[in-house]
Each structure stands twice: as C-alpha cells, then as structure tokens.
Amino acid sequence: MKKDIVKPSILPGFMELLPADQIVFNKMKDTIRHNYEKFGFIPLDTPTIEKSEILLAKGGGETEKQIYRFNKGNTDLSLRFDLTVPLARYVSQHFSDLNFPFRRYHISKVFRGERNQKGRFREFYQCDIDIIGNGSLSIINDAEIPSIIYQTFKELGFEDFTIRINNRKVLNGFFEGTDVEDRKGVLRAIDKIEKIGEDGVRKELQELGLEDSKIDKIINFINIKGTKSEVIKSLKELDIENDVFKEGVYELEKVVHYIKSFNVPDKNYKIDLTIARGLDYYTGTVYETVLNNYPQIGSVCSGGRYDNLAEHYTNQKLPGVGISIGLTRLFYQLREAKIIGENASSTLSQALVIPVGDTMEYSIKVANKLRENEIISELYLEDAKIGKKFAYADKLKIPYVILIGEDELKEEKVSVKNMETGNQESMSLEEAIKIIKNA
C-alpha cells in the first residue's frame, strides 16, 4: 500500500538557501562579525521568544499587527521583531552586571508578519551594533560608527558607497522655528523622498495641511547641498534662533570633524538633510548607507542616536547610538543584481581524496594529515567509477583532487590534480599540502 507523501515546502517569506548561496551568505555574516569584533564589540544573544508585554511596552499599533504572537499555558508570548527591544530589556535587567559604555553586537534572526511580496521577509537576519551609555554618552561615539560602516562594507568588497548623515535636532529645531506642528508627519514625508521624489513629498506635506510658504521653506531646507563644510556654513547662515537647531548643527559639525580622524575617506560620507529615519526613537545623529552603483537597493545600513533606550523597562537614563545591517535583504538584492553568487562553490572543501583499489587506510591517513594542516578535505567513500568521482569534485568546484592508487601507496606519495588547469602530478604529501595551502 502506497503511503501518503507530504509535499515538501516552506512558508512564503522564510529563508532557506542552497549550499552555494548559504556559503556566500555565511561569509558575509562572518565578515560583518569580524569587523564588529575588531572595534571591541562583544557578542550578545537573546531568546527568540520574549514575553509579549516586553515587545509591546511602547504601545501596540503597527508593532502589534506585525508580531507573531501566541499563548503557551497562561503566558502571552511573541517572536522578537527586532534586536533593539531585546537589547533594551537585557540592559535594564542586567544593568548592575554590565560595564558602561556597553558595546554589543547581535547577529540573529528576527520575525515579522509582513505581507507576502517581493523584497519583504517574515524571517530575516539583522546585524546590529550599539554603544549604550549610563546617563550620558560622548558625541564622538557617533563619529566612530561611520568608520565601522566603512570598514565593514570595504571588507565585503564595496568601494563606491556613501554614508549619509544628518541630525534629528537640526530637523526638529528647523520645524520649531518654522512653526510646523505635525513634525512626525513631516519627518515621515521627508524620509520617503528617495521613493516618491520632491513632488511626492510636496504632495504629502499639502495633505498634512501645510501652507505653500511653509512647504517651500521645508523643500528649500532639505535641498541645501555641497561639501560638508559648505552645508554646515549654510545651516549657520539660516540664522535660526532655536536652541535645538543650534545644538543639532553643533553636534553635526563635531561628528563630521571626527569622522575624518577615524580615517573614513572623504568620498564615502556626506551630510544629507533629507535623512530623517522614520523611527520615533532617534533623537540626534542619523545614518543611511547606499551603494552608489545600485541605488535601486536602497539603504543597506542605517541607524542613529537615541536618548533613552530603555525608558519602558527602567528609570535609568541609557542613551545610545547604533546601526543595523539587514543581511537577508542585502544578500537577496545583491544576488539579484548579480553582484554576488555568480560561479559560487557549493562546498567549502579544498581537496577531495579519492582511494583507488585497496588503498582506503592510506587514503584515510592522507585525509587526516590534510585536516591537521587546516586544509578542508573530503574523502570519497562510495563505490563508483572514477569518472563519477571526478564529476563530483567538478560539480562542487573542489579545486584539488588527490588520487591514491597502488603506486602512491607503495611510494608513500599522492597524485594531485588541479581541477581548474587539468594538471596532474605525483608528489610527496608535504609538497601537496604546501601547494594547496598556497593556492
């Protein structure tokens, strides 16, 4: 009797990769982690499941619609939707055990109940860093963040990218001086300028009820461009008598000055007054990073300064600054643009050891020796024709095949074939190790 077969499938919006893509993805993740650690950030992992009251402490609304929520017994539980709220809970809970400023990185999956559409994921990796202060946090931390972004994306293989920097106090102070009431609405409209253009922003501002004279002032303001020093000079010349605005300009000038000290090339960062970052909790410096040759990808790394990370969990004032790389989205978009993944290998193996005839024990010794020398190696153990064994290596793009036949066994040598050039020669195992390690 034929048994029922369940059709193998996964839910839309969840991530699953074939080996070649998974290897590329993991290398990107390792590169990001390496750079975060290079700047002294320590690893943190928190539970995937949190109490719903923790995740919803700020209030429901859009967050409540997006989280995966369920009950286990009498406990109301949810899957985390970002890494920032768990950080706030963690720092509040373990406050007395932590050293401040607390520098942590967290690379892990988060979950959101997004609508199923292209470019939207329900399960995805975020790669976050944050520097949390106790009571206060030097503004120079805000200047160090772009150097971390720069080093990370450079090591990921990018040269032509721009870190766009602004300060929310500059925007808020300007709006106060312009007598704009719905500042959140205006910030959200400005934040969409990349997607909807200047005319779209103008239309949204009209829908918010702003008169044309105020809209013109806002549009003229966000269009202030030039070198970093020219933009700062233009902001000062606006002569806005507002303390918040003045503080924002001062902070922006200081951050830009110190970014240079952190050896970030001038071409890789600029002041952009359209950068608002839609999230309400940003209170100072804000960042967005774009790959200049691939504007359709949008921001690949963003973040900013916030005054009070954990106000819903503690009375301690915990200011911070941080960024997040949405790795899953970045990976898929880079792959779609054919920037990564072309001709990627489906294995990590550097060598495939193939026993021919009665040479299994010597072949095992050879594989052991390769691994002792940090060469990732496979041993082909299946009974198959030699052509099939070579086809296996070729399909996986294993660069070297080591053949062990009766002659190699007698002479205690190995026969090494370079799969790219087709060259094959007999040599000592020590020579083979040297060649493979130097390849």
From Swiss-Prot:
Q: Which reaction(s) are listed as its catalytic activity?
A: tRNA(His) + L-histidine + ATP = L-histidyl-tRNA(His) + AMP + diphosphate + H(+)
Instruction: Fetch the CDD domains from UniProt.
Output: HisRS-like_core, HisRS_anticodon
Please give the Gene Ontology molecular function terms for this protein: ATP binding; catalytic activity, acting on a protein; histidine-tRNA ligase activity; transferase activity
Instruction: Kindly give the InterPro entries that the UniProt entry links to this protein.
Output: aa-tRNA-synth_II, aa-tRNA-synth_II/BPL/LPL, Anticodon-bd, Anticodon-bd_dom_sf, His-tRNA-ligase, HisRS-like_core, HisRS/HisZ, HisRS_anticodon
> Which EC number(s) are documented for this chain?
6.1.1.21
- Residues crossing the lipid bilayer are none
HAMAP family assigned to the protein according to its UniProt record, in alphabetical order = His_tRNA_synth
Q: Which family does the record assign? A: Belongs to the class-II aminoacyl-tRNA synthetase family.
Summarize subunit and interaction data from the UniProt record for this chain: Homodimer.
What protein is this chain from? Histidine--tRNA ligase
Q: What species does this protein belong to?
A: Clostridium tetani (strain Massachusetts / E88)
